[in-house]
């Protein structure tokens, strides 16, 4: 074939290469995307996916992926132009660079919404994506793992289809590969699958916990983030899964050490996992306590602020809820002051709610537990948030429940006195019941109660409260001589002055 004949073909090929590469480069900068879209670039790139030159196919796919990644509108354009089907057809070719770019397109489309992810699945992409997990090239495996992850994350139906495509075993094998980027992608995708429900978490746990838990001690921050989140997403669904995770971790110290990590997200995800573990059974809570967990958790909530504290605070509450000795371990770890700090100083109401929940469970077991909590002056704070009209409904509920739990075991009457003057009727009932329980026959407490204004307060409110509360006040009054009760009554001074006035008038006559 003469040079004159070949030259136009060579120039045409060079032009296609230049065009596809230039568009891929332009699409890497967000400020160019709208102009490219307006120029109809998607329709021009589509035929290049079937080009005979592999580098052109690859550049075209990369450009389409970058365009789809930019917006949902462009991702929908990829679906509407039937580009996904074309990519799936081309995946049968052995070009690893094109396979990586095609997986990137699937990820870029699927990430925007469940509907677009479903379009990718309905186009038949799952089987070739799972096959890409078995490719020799780790970058192809990584791209496929991310695409499967972005499909799985939206809902349980899509994640179930990924599981049914036999992706889980291949993803677990990817975790065992030496490439760190591939490990990260596999761990994140398994986490997306496991997050939805127990049925999806179970195959991940059955086949992968030995491998997954090994990486708790791995020296890579992003991987540890993903692993802690993955373990939490497995654990959260049931006590059985939590037990499986604990059995495979073997030494809880490995997980607790993640709370000491230099990276805040590792710490947050580890706290999430621990929170889900201790919530599921007293045995799990005991294992964490035996490994020194309360002290490490307290250090965690001391040194971190904002939302990550939530999981640590809830963990202390869950541990304390099960048994009195576990609650005492939380007290001995000096948790109460940090819980009080969260209640008083955290700006987020859901964290205040968690602090109320934890303090309520710490203080509910016995008079000793209650005293430790009430001595920290948290009862007044809880009552304040319960009565504050700006508090959320959840904060009010948690504060009310915690107050009742702690007060019902409180023998430290001096800590109840400040509440007596401001407590609403439903809390006042619990306070009065404690006075009835501990004042009777205790002359020291009776004197203190009278001298500190408590007895006088009861006389002031006696006629303003409902009959049930009047009965309780009457029972407390019965512990004192009648003249003492009369002395602290609101009308006593007026009655006395009337007597004086009456006596003076008689003398003048």
Predicted regions and their residues:
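Short, hydrophobic/charged alpha-helical patches characteristic of ARM/HEAT alpha-solenoid repeats
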Residues: 7-10, 14, 32-39, 56, ...
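Alpha-solenoid helical repeat architecture
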Residues: 8-11, 49-52, 91-94, 133-136, ...
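Alpha-helical solenoid repeat architecture
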Residues: 17-30, 44-47, 58-70, 89, ...
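Alpha-solenoid helical-repeat scaffold
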Residues: 331, 349, 356, 362-509
């Amino acid at each position: 074939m003469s040079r004159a004949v070949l030259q136009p073909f060579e120039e045409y090929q060079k032009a296609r290469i230049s065009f596809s590469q230039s568009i891929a480069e332009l699409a890497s900068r967000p400020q160019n995307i709208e102009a490219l879209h307006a120029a109809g670039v998607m329709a021009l790139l589509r035929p290049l996916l079937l080009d005979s030159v592999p580098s052109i196919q690859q550049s075209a796919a990369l450009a389409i992926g970058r365009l789809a990644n930019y917006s949902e509108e462009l991702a929908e354009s990829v679906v509407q132009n039937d580009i996904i089907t074309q990519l799936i057809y081309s995946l049968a070719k052995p070009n690893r660079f094109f396979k990586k770019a095609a997986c990137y397109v699937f990820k870029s489309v699927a990430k925007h919404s469940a509907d677009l992810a479903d379009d990718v699945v309905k186009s038949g992409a799952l089987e070739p994506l799972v096959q890409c997990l078995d490719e020799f090239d780790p970058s192809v495996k990584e791209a496929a793992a991310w695409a499967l992850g972005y499909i799985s994350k939206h809902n349980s139906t899509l994640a179930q289809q990924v599981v049914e495509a036999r992706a889980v075993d291949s993803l677990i094998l990817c975790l065992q590969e030496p490439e760190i980027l591939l490990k990260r992608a596999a761990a994140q995708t398994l986490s997306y699958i496991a997050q939805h429900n127990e049925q999806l978490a179970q195959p991940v746990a059955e086949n992968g916990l030995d491998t997954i838990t090994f990486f708790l001690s791995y020296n890579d921050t992003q991987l540890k983030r993903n692993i802690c989140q993955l373990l939490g997403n497995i654990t959260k669904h049931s006590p059985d899964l939590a037990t499986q995770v604990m059995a495979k971790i073997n030494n809880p110290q490995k997980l607790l050490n993640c709370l000491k990590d230099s990276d805040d997200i590792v710490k947050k995800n580890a706290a999430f996992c621990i929170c889900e573990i201790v919530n599921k059974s007293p045995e799990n809570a005991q294992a964490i306590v035996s490994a020194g967990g309360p002290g490490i958790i307290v250090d965690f909530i001391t040194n971190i602020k904002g939302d990550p504290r939530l999981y640590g605070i809830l963990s202390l509450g869950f541990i304390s809820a099960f048994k009195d000795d576990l609650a005492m371990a939380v007290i001995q770890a000096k948790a109460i002051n940090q819980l009080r700090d969260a209640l008083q100083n955290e700006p987020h109401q859901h964290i205040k709610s968690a602090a109320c929940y934890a303090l309520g469970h710490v203080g509910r077991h016995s008079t000793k537990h209650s005293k430790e909590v009430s001595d920290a002056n948290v009862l007044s704070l809880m009552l304040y948030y319960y009565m504050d009209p700006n508090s959320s409904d959840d904060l009010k509920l948690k504060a009310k429940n915690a107050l009742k739990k702690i007060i019902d075991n409180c023998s430290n009457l001096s800590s109840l006195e400040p509440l007596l003057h401001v407590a609403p009727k439903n809390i006042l009932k619990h306070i009065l019941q404690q006075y009835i329980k501990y004042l009777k026959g205790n002359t020291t407490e009776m004197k203190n109660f009278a001298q500190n204004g408590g007895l006088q307060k009861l006389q002031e409110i006696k006629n303003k409260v409902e009959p049930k509360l009047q009965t309780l006040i009457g029972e407390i009054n019965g512990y004192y001589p009648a003249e003492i009760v009369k002395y602290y009554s609101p009308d006593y001074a007026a009655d006395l002055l009337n007597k004086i006035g009456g006596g003076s008038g008689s003398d003048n006559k």
